[in-house]
């Protein structure tokens, strides 16, 4: 069988799996059985083999500094059943995209303190309260694209000290029901496009320090005056397209020092009312109105 396989990558994976199966069988039938199995590095293929282990083994996966666990497009219940038997010491990336899960409460015992990237795209998540249970002080990227989230009030109780990218696009958020300040000192990209946003007045509860890209396109927003109250000095790209905005004069009052992309397409903008603003913005911005 191995002679017919030309791809070095596939061949390597198959050989690796065979070796791991051999190791597991040796341990399984050894009278002096080990209670803990240390595996130097984890990958998806090895994870599948690990599942064959007897339940009484406590697995300790020790990876390199940047330990990545990819479990995309799997059954959430089955994933949690086996992840909870594994002790992660240095997990920095966790990909649970298309995993058919609605929360992460089953993983509360897992050490995610070093996690930097968490991908939960395309699941059935409607509540984000579970995030509070994890110590995610080192998290840099949180992606919740394509879920059923309608309420983000839980952000009031979460400290995003190092978060740089937050993707909440294509959810069901209508109103930003936040009444307390939420600090995003290092956030550079915020994507809330293609939700059901009508009112973004509560955006003034967000404290941005380094925001460079903001997407709120594809909603039902009519009033964008709140943007004047935000710290957008570092903003480079602003996407407001596909909303119901008719008055954009507030944009002329904001000091967009580095803005080079402003998308206002597919909005019922009043050209006469906003002519001065359109002219002012058009002098310095590459793409602003069509």
What positions do the PLM features span?
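C-terminal capping region of solenoid repeat domains
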Residues: 233, 237-242, 257-290
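A structural signal for leucine-rich repeat
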Residues: 83-87, 106-112, 129-137, 153-161, ...
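Conserved small-residue-rich
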Residues: 60-96
């Amino acid at each position: 069988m191995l002679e017919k396989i030309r791809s070095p990558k596939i061949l390597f994976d198959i050989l690796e799996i065979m070796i791991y199966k051999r190791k597991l069988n040796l341990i399984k039938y050894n009278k002096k059985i080990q209670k803990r199995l240390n595996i130097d590095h984890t990958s998806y293929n090895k994870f599948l083999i690990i599942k064959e282990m007897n339940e009484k083994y406590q697995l300790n996966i020790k990876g390199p500094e940047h330990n990545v666990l990819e479990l995309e497009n799997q059954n959430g219940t089955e994933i949690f059943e086996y992840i909870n038997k594994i002790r992660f010491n240095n997990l920095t990336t966790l990909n649970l995209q298309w995993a058919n899960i609605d929360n992460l409460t089953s993983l509360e015992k897992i050490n995610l303190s070093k996690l930097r990237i968490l991908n939960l795209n395309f699941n059935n998540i409607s509540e984000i309260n579970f995030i509070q249970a994890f110590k995610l002080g080192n998290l840099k990227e949180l992606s919740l694209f394509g879920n059923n989230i309608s309420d983000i009030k839980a952000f009031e109780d979460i400290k995003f000290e190092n978060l740089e990218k937050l993707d909440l696009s294509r959810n069901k958020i209508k109103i930003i029901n936040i009444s307390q300040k939420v600090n995003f000192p290092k956030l550079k990209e915020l994507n809330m496009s293609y939700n059901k946003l009508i009112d973004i007045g509560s955006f003034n509860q967000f404290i941005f320090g380094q925001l460079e890209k903001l997407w709120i396109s594809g909603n039902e927003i009519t009033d964008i005056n709140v943007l004047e109250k935000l710290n957008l000095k570092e903003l480079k790209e602003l996407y407001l397209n596909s909303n119901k905005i008719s008055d954009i004069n507030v944009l002329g009052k904001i000091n967009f020092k580095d803005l080079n992309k402003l998308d206002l397409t597919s909005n019922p903008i009043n050209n006469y009312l906003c002519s001065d603003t359109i002219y002012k913005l058009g002098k310095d911005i590459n793409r602003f109105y069509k």
